[in-house]
Amino acid sequence: MKHREGIEKERENLRTVFKKMFSITEDAASNEEIRDRILTGGKITGTNMVVMICAILIASVGLNTNSVAVIIGAMLISPLMGSILAISYGTVSNDAYLMKRHSVGFAVQILISVATATIYFLLSPIKEPTEQLLARTNPNFFDVMIALAGGIAGIVGQTRQDKANNIIPGVAIATALMPPLCTCGYAIANGNLRMLLGAFYLFIINAYFIYIASDLMLSLIHI
């Protein structure tokens, strides 16, 4: 009897250890702070829009010159993921107004991004597709895995008490929302429909699965 009780106690201790080890609510910020962070990141006015256009131009140059370092720099400053998290927040909190506002805002960001990239590639003297451009035209299952993992990590980073964490920059690089849109601009500028469809499909995959992962994590945090 004592032996059985000892086993049950050990099991309970293990459950407690694992629960604490993988808890996402233990060091979470308050709901008010989470809301403020996510909605601020999803704004399409002021600083966010200026930064987005700069990021698009930087990413376009990087893709056009086949420079991985420049592309990474553009992904680090891109605000696109903020809009996806804001849409997800509106979904989980059952706020139709937030969902609509940030969905429209995200669509505007996409249009401006593609238009900016198209103008750049129309003016660029380099017309040949680089390795980095072509890499954004063939989405596969691994892109889905990256987007899901990135969405989970991204929302966890946004909901921590400590804002000064290194999660968001890493997620921005991993999920790569900006380069596919720039590739769409290249495809439009050069009349390449197949490349346009492939690049936009990759962008949709990334955005959708980041959204799904964010929904799941926000639900678990009980926003």
Q: Predicted segment positions?
A:
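Alpha-helical transmembrane segments and their membrane-interface boundaries
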Residues: 2-13, 17-147, 160, 164
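Hydrophobic alpha-helical segments
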Residues: 133-208, 213-217
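Conserved small/polar residues in nucleotide/adenosyl-binding loops
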Residues: 221-223
